[in-house]
Amino acid sequence: MATGDDIPTFKLVLVGDGGTGKTTFVKRHLTGDPEKKYVATLGVEVHPLIFHTNRGQIRFNVWDTAGQEKFGGLRDGYYIQGQCAIIMFDVTARVTYKNVPNWHRDLARVCENIPIVLCGNFVDVKDRKVKAKTITFHRKKNLQYYDISAKSNYNFEKPSLWLVRKLLGDPNLEFVAMPALAPPEVQMDPTMVAQYEQEIAAAANAELPDDDEDL
């Protein structure tokens, strides 16, 4: 854990296929320092995001690939000293979920046992292809999973809160002020939200498949 301005600071590695909403996820947060840094050697943007908790302020330096993943795998320098990670996929594109194990493998190889959240983005889109019952990778690898929607801010604070609790070893830690987010561009249908949450709860109790048919 690095400290800058006496604020506990963690390197958060954000990975996933191109077009899954990683940059949008970062830019929806208005808590970031506009002085983002660009690491030209790695083709990476580093966005500082500050969260206010009952344990004081916490800063994530979020490493965003700036589209580099479209040209093949990321360099190890992107992952080195990563202390936590978010793997993002698009629930409307099955191939982005099928590639999750590849991103996890690279993270595990370089960063070993860091807390990781898997996020299925674009759950505001009605034509969902990757259903809750088929999302089992996180259970096999002991990751946390959340449905999220970048455009509606649905569940947006949950990945960050879960990671902070893990990093500080405090399951009771809370945000004292909700993260400042850009206004939602779309509204989630409450009926759809209730259905998805019910499906995720049911999937959490279902038996895991023996093989990787879910991928």
Swiss-Prot record:
<feature type="region of interest" description="Switch-II">
    <location>
        <begin position="67"/>
        <end position="83"/>
    </location>
</feature>
<dbReference type="InterPro" id="IPR001806">
    <property type="entry name" value="Small_GTPase"/>
</dbReference>
<dbReference type="InterPro" id="IPR027417">
    <property type="entry name" value="P-loop_NTPase"/>
</dbReference>
<feature type="region of interest" description="Interaction with RANBP1">
    <location>
        <begin position="210"/>
        <end position="215"/>
    </location>
</feature>
<feature type="region of interest" description="Switch-I">
    <location>
        <begin position="36"/>
        <end position="44"/>
    </location>
</feature>
<keyword id="KW-0342">GTP-binding</keyword>
<dbReference type="GO" id="GO:0006606">
    <property type="term" value="P:protein import into nucleus"/>
</dbReference>
<feature type="domain" description="Small GTPase Ran-type">
    <location>
        <begin position="6"/>
        <end position="170"/>
    </location>
</feature>
<comment type="function">
    <text>GTPase involved in nucleocytoplasmic transport, participating both to the import and the export from the nucleus of proteins and RNAs. Switches between a cytoplasmic GDP- and a nuclear GTP-bound state by nucleotide exchange and GTP hydrolysis. Nuclear import receptors such as importin beta bind their substrates only in the absence of GTP-bound RAN and release them upon direct interaction with GTP-bound RAN, while export receptors behave in the opposite way.</text>
</comment>
<dbReference type="GO" id="GO:0005525">
    <property type="term" value="F:GTP binding"/>
</dbReference>
<feature type="site" description="Essential for GTP hydrolysis">
    <location>
        <position position="68"/>
    </location>
</feature>
<dbReference type="InterPro" id="IPR002041">
    <property type="entry name" value="Ran_GTPase"/>
</dbReference>
<comment type="similarity">
    <text>Belongs to the small GTPase superfamily. Ran family.</text>
</comment>
<keyword id="KW-0539">Nucleus</keyword>
<dbReference type="GO" id="GO:0005829">
    <property type="term" value="C:cytosol"/>
</dbReference>
<feature type="binding site">
    <location>
        <begin position="149"/>
        <end position="151"/>
    </location>
    <ligand>
        <name>GTP</name>
    </ligand>
</feature>
<feature type="binding site">
    <location>
        <begin position="17"/>
        <end position="24"/>
    </location>
    <ligand>
        <name>GTP</name>
    </ligand>
</feature>
<protein>
    <recommendedName>
        <fullName>GTP-binding nuclear protein Ran</fullName>
    </recommendedName>
</protein>
<comment type="subunit">
    <text>Monomer. Interacts with RANGAP1, which promotes RAN-mediated GTP hydrolysis. Interacts with KPNB1. Interaction with KPNB1 inhibits RANGAP1-mediated stimulation of GTPase activity. Interacts with RCC1 which promotes the exchange of RAN-bound GDP by GTP. Interaction with KPNB1 inhibits RCC1-mediated exchange of RAN-bound GDP by GTP. Interacts (GTP-bound form) with TNPO1; the interaction is direct. Interacts with KPNB1 and with TNPO1; both inhibit RAN GTPase activity. Interacts (via C-terminus) with RANBP1, which alleviates the inhibition of RAN GTPase activity.</text>
</comment>
<keyword id="KW-0813">Transport</keyword>
<feature type="binding site">
    <location>
        <begin position="121"/>
        <end position="124"/>
    </location>
    <ligand>
        <name>GTP</name>
    </ligand>
</feature>
<dbReference type="GO" id="GO:0005635">
    <property type="term" value="C:nuclear envelope"/>
</dbReference>
<keyword id="KW-0479">Metal-binding</keyword>
<keyword id="KW-0963">Cytoplasm</keyword>
<dbReference type="GO" id="GO:0003924">
    <property type="term" value="F:GTPase activity"/>
</dbReference>
<keyword id="KW-0547">Nucleotide-binding</keyword>
<dbReference type="GO" id="GO:0000054">
    <property type="term" value="P:ribosomal subunit export from nucleus"/>
</dbReference>
<dbReference type="Pfam" id="PF00071">
    <property type="entry name" value="Ras"/>
</dbReference>
<feature type="binding site">
    <location>
        <position position="67"/>
    </location>
    <ligand>
        <name>GTP</name>
    </ligand>
</feature>
<dbReference type="GO" id="GO:0046872">
    <property type="term" value="F:metal ion binding"/>
</dbReference>
<keyword id="KW-0653">Protein transport</keyword>
<feature type="binding site">
    <location>
        <begin position="35"/>
        <end position="41"/>
    </location>
    <ligand>
        <name>GTP</name>
    </ligand>
</feature>
<keyword id="KW-0460">Magnesium</keyword>
<dbReference type="InterPro" id="IPR005225">
    <property type="entry name" value="Small_GTP-bd"/>
</dbReference>
